[in-house]
Swiss-Prot record:
Domain called LisH: residue spans: 121-153
Protein name: E3 ubiquitin-protein transferase MAEA
The keyword Nucleus belongs to this UniProt entry's keyword annotation: yes
Family annotation (CDD domains): RING-Ubox_Emp (cd16659)
Key words of the record: Actin-binding, Cell cycle, Cell division, Cell membrane, Cytoplasm, Cytoskeleton, Erythrocyte maturation, Membrane, Metal-binding, Nucleus, Transferase, Ubl conjugation pathway, Zinc, Zinc-finger
Organism: Danio rerio
One Gene Ontology cellular component annotation held by this UniProt entry: plasma membrane
Length: 396
């Protein structure tokens, strides 16, 4: 029963952590399916139009050359329809195969072969590291690790590389690439009630003011801000006030609007919307897993100022992770376990806790192992006591 419960918990944890592994390729498949549907519908309508024109012409006894010309047009439209359909099917097939490959990979965790499970765990760790590196901007390192580990089809490199192009264009203070991304994902961004495109148009207006192209700014506003409403309308009113001030004004809020730091805000906004679009969290799975693991073993002993209670085998006690775990909650322990400072063994009925006269507690087996001439030396204070002075501790 306990084994089944543990397996169920592992399966649930896997579903939570591996959600992005399947969600991203599924969303790509869904996007390609919708695009294919639009393309085929458009090409089909073109075929229908030329066929209707051919039928209309045939009803009026046309000359042969006219019919041949119309037939050539029908063949051309049918060829275009066939080509678009083949391209769409191929793109959908690639996405479907990628989804299948990832599902098969996730199924490997339930293998009966320990060696296979260990290989799967190694791949999973590599996947977590690749995603974390991509989020941190180490794209070349992430791509090399994915290639060396053979997991290129198990990680979302393409999505992050696309995001990299957009972010780099915003760093260059260019909006075209990001606007193209918004256009490609227009319907889903609208459902998310994203304001990214509006923010980009606002920034374009600000840049025109900065360049003292005020008439261009007015035309830009008429074109892109006419449909603004609610909070957006208030923002439009605010930026329109910039028309009355020079580009080097020190008057707030126009000085803040002209601050180049707004481009960094746009990068953060794009990153946030991109993660929401693919239903990814703001933190990587590696970060979440690491924090959960640190929190599970974090105790008050890890932060004692004297440092004597720190365990060299405890990750939280190590310098590299101690600060990282500081804001995390302590481990939830319904039943406490006493661990011997000397051996690291659990103190229980087979290894009862023994207290020396100075108040420090160690396991009975450890005191036996360090006893010499019926005396023991406390590892912490270096005080010497008779072995018989150690008293058994009882926990109520």
């Amino acid at each position: 029963m306990a084994v089944q419960e543990t397996a169920a918990q592992l399966s649930m944890a896997l579903k939570v952590q591996e959600y992005p592994t399947l969600k991203v390729p599924y969303e790509t498949l869904n996007k390609r399916f919708r695009a294919a549907q639009k393309n085929i519908d458009r090409e089909t309508s073109h075929v229908t139009m030329v066929v209707a024109e051919l039928e209309k012409t045939l009803s009026s006894f046309p000359v042969v050359d006219t019919v041949v010309s119309l037939l050539d047009g029908v063949v051309e439209k049918l060829s275009a329809l066939k080509r678009k359909a083949a391209e769409s099917i191929q793109a959908e097939d690639e996405s479907a195969k990628l989804c299948k490959r990832r599902i098969e990979h996730l199924k490997e965790h339930s293998s009966d072969q320990p060696a296979s499970v260990n290989v799967w765990k190694k791949k999973r760790m590599d996947r977590m590291m690749v995603e974390h590196l991509l989020r941190c901007g180490y794209y070349n390192t992430a791509v090399k690790l994915a290639r060396q580990s053979g997991i290129e089809d198990l990680v979302n490199i393409e999505m992050f590389l696309t995001a990299k192009e957009v972010e780099e264009s915003l760093e260059r203070q260019e909006t075209a690439t990001c606007l193209a991304w918004c256009h490609d994902n227009k319907s889903r961004l609208r459902k998310m009630k994203s304001c990214l495109e509006f923010s980009l148009r606002i920034q374009e207006f600000i840049e025109l003011i900065r360049q003292n192209k005020r008439m261009d700014a007015v035309r830009h506003a008429r074109k892109h801000f006419s449909q603004a409403e609610g909070g957006q309308l208030d923002e439009v009113r605010q930026v329109m006030g910039m028309l009355a001030f020079p580009s080097d004004t020190h008057i707030s809020p126009y000085k803040d609007l002209l601050d180049p730091a707004r481009w960094k805000m746009l990068i953060q906004q794009f990153r946030y919307d991109n993660y929401r679009l693919h239903q990814l969290g703001n933190n990587s799975v590696f970060t979440i897993t690491l924090q959960a693991g640190l929190s599970a073993i974090k105790t008050p002993q890890c932060y004692k100022e004297d440092g004597t209670s720190k365990n060299p085998d405890c990750p939280v006690c190590s310098k590299s992770l101690n600060k990282l775990a500081q804001p995390l909650p302590m481990a939830h322990c319904a039943n406490s376990r006493l661990v011997c400072k000397i051996s690291g063994e659990v103190m229980n009925e087979n290894n009862p806790p023994m207290m020396l006269p100075n108040g420090y507690v160690y396991g009975y087996n450890s005191l036996l192992s360090i006893r010499q001439d019926d005396k023991v030396i406390c590892p912490r204070t270096k005080e010497v006591f008779n072995f018989s002075q150690a008293e058994k501790v009882y926990i109520m």
